[in-house]
Amino acid sequence: MLLMLPGLMAPFLISLVMIFRSKNAALKGDFVNRLTNIRLIRPGILPVFFLIMPLSVVVSIFISLFFGGSMSQFQLAEGFSFSTGFVPVLLLLLLAAGFEELGWRGYAFDSLQSRHTYFKASVIFSVLWSLWHFPLIFVNNSYQYEIFHESFWYGLNFFVSIIPLGMIISWICIKNGKSIIAAIVFHFIVNMSQEILDITQTTKCIQTAVLLIVTIALIAYDREMFFSRAHLGKRST
């Protein structure tokens, strides 16, 4: 499990090297601004920001009831669904959100969207982000290890679920001036929403479908943003 921490830090560290080795002062300034400027976060987006994930969990539990799911899923979970053995799980969830988004939204996604529409960049990024988690199925006691040993299909669902989640985080980030803070906070909300209630893996499969519907709705609602080409080529690396 000690190998998890360097793995979590890798996106951030690689991004720091790429950014600060660059001779582009604007790139460095933009990174610092998106990391520190809380005013980039739009108050009007906050209800969506805080409610998408908790509501997706609640809706998924209600749907699961029609397929034999239990009302006990509305109870608070007695503990986390995995263990680390070296740092508290809550701290790990926060570190995961922080280090991942510092790298992913701080540099990687920004680099992709300079070459592609937001839609295409989001799809590419989400698939790559999903695959990035794959080695964790071999890390004893990790969440991915636990669910893959419970059921191959539950493990597969985890990787599929990351794709609509990545699209949603991209939308949240873009709508808030590409704020890295917004991405970190939303990512942490995602992590906590999966742990706070006693939901089953079957319900999490249902949640993947719910998140896919939410993603399609966001794309339809903000089609102009997702498919705009106005921003292409504006960021040099």
Locations of regions flagged by a protein language model:
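Histidine-centered divalent metal-coordination motifs
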Residues: 101, 133, 187, 191
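Functionally important transmembrane alpha-helices
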Residues: 147-210
